[in-house]
């Protein structure tokens, strides 16, 4: 926090930026990954609104790591006493996660995008990004601004 607190930060990604622009009219958009899974779930459990998981994909296409993460979120949320009406994509993501939950890194590593990232020397990034609950923060986008969520 000390590095970024009070500063404007400009970020661009190939897929995440497009997703954020597409969701700019949403009331708020929480940003999550395996790295902040537990923190994101705590925030979502406090939200009384409809929740939609928007996966960025890769170059406009489905990617395994997004589906695994969405499935992890759906799986955890469904274990609570909440009732959810799941879409087919939510059900499928959940099944994918349930099948691969003990080998997330290997599943991502063996995906098309995982092979690509390894081919350009970024396999260590895959391993890092498959870690669970490494950070206890949740970025939230409201309008065109991203800040840290202070809900939890």
Question: Language-model segments: which ranges?
Answer:
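Internal active-site segments that recognize and position negatively charged phosphoryl groups
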Residues: 18, 22-23, 38-44
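Short, structured patches in soluble enzyme cores that scaffold and shape functional sites
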Residues: 11-15, 33, 53-57
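Glycine-rich phosphate/diphosphate-binding loops that line cofactor/substrate pockets in enzymes
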Residues: 43-51
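Long, charged alpha-helical interface segments
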Residues: 1-14, 22-28, 48, 64-152
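Short, acidic/small-residue loops that bind anionic groups at enzyme active sites
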Residues: 30-42, 80-85
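Active-site-proximal helix/loop microenvironment
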Residues: 53, 59-66
């Amino acid at each position: 926090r000390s590095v970024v607190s009070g500063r404007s930060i400009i970020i661009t990604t190939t897929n995440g930026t497009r997703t954020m622009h597409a969701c700019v009219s949403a009331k708020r958009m929480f940003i999550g990954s395996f790295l902040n899974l537990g923190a994101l779930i705590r925030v979502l459990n406090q939200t009384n609104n409809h929740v939609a998981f928007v996966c960025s994909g890769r170059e406009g296409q489905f990617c395994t790591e997004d589906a695994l993460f969405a499935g992890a979120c759906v799986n955890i949320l469904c274990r609570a006493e909440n009732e959810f009406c799941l879409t087919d994509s939510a059900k499928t993501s959940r099944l994918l996660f349930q099948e691969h939950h003990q080998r997330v890194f290997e599943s991502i590593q063996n995906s098309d995008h995982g092979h690509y990232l390894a081919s350009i020397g970024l396999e260590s990034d895959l391993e890092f990004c498959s870690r669970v609950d490494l950070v206890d923060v949740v970025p939230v986008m409201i309008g065109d601004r991203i800040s840290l969520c202070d809900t939890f």
